[in-house]
Structure formats: C-alpha cells, structure tokens
Amino acid sequence: MFKKVLAGFVAAAMVATMAGCGSSNSSTKDSGSDKAAAEATTEAAAPAKVLNTNAANKLIYCITPSTSNPYFGTVQTACKEEGEKLGYKVKCVSHDDDATKQSELFDTAISEGASAIVCDNAGADASIEAVQKAYDAGIPTFMVDREINKEGLCVSQIVANNDQGAQAAAEALVEATGGKGDYAELLGLESDTNCQVRSNAFHRVLDQTDMKMVAQQSANWD
C-alpha cells in the first residue's frame, strides 16, 4: 500500500510540475496509520527552468535499484500504472545500485527528452552529478525512497520517515524481550542514507536497555 501511496504522491507532483506550478517549502505527510508514513518534501525555490521544457513529450523515466528486490519492482509497477493513467509513457529501468550506470541512464533520459525523471537513487552523494545533469537540461527529478545530499536540484524528495519507523521497531523489540538479551543487526546498503538513519534510531532505543548487540552485518537490501 505504501508503494501505491508513494506513486500517487509522485504522480500528483508531476501533474503540478507539468502544469507549470511553482514549488513551496512545505512538507506533506500521508494520513495513513503506518508510523513509517510517506513524507513529501518540496525543494526550496525550484527554478522555472525545471518546470518543464519537455512537458509535451509525455515521457517519464522511472529509475530504481534492481527489481530482483520485490519492493523496487512494486515501485516501478506503481509508477508505470499511475503515469499511464495520466497519459504518460513510462520507461522503467534499473541502475543496480551502480552510480555510473545510473548516470548513463540519466543521460539516456535526457537525450530522449524525458518530461520528468522519478528515481530511487544509487547513493546520496554519488547521485548528485546525475541529478545535476537533468537539472541543467531542464528536466525535473522526483526522488523517492532515498534522498540525495544536496537541496535545490530535485523538485521533490518523497521519502518514508525512517527514523520514526526504526524507533517503533526497536520499541516493539524491547517490549517483546523485556529489554534483555543479545541481538544481531542486519543493515541495508551501508552507503545509503536510509540505512544510517534506521540504525541510529534503532540504537537510540536499544542502547538504553540491557540488550547487547553481538553481531552486525550488511545485507545490502537483499
């Protein structure tokens, strides 16, 4: 359900962008019951030049990590379904968490005159250059699930509240164990901002208990 809501946020944001609407500095949270709710943050003062030079082409590129992970497959499917409902052709491709491949996919989207790019990126810092190229070409980028570490390049960065979600999970673990015992922590992709945020929030709760971490290993989201 979260993926559908996220895709809906993206679709609504793209409609506003294609219509030439300006952006604001406000944040919008999904009204659903999930504690890890979707949060849409509109970048400060997105310039008119990314609002959008290729709108008439009605082509959206959706760029995500490998769809071997069902989550990213669902993101692509939802984006495609929502985009097509609005009359856009949606091309879904994967960067496989390779920043170089991601950059090449951005180049292709730019050369084909994409109206917009939706991206679940290959690294908060490593993705800045690719997004900058789209920005310079007048193509708006909507970042989903994972942010990049530079403001003003994306029209929106639509992400889950990973801090809140991880804290809730840690609190549930403490309740189930009475705050005692050993545990192992499986991390996501360690270069990913979401991984760091979740781990920090998890430890903010567990480090106040008598629980002991005996192992920590990256699962790279697989």
Q: How does the language model describe each region?
A:
Residues 2-4, 8, 14, 18-222:
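A residue-level marker of the well-folded mature domains of exported/periplasmic proteins
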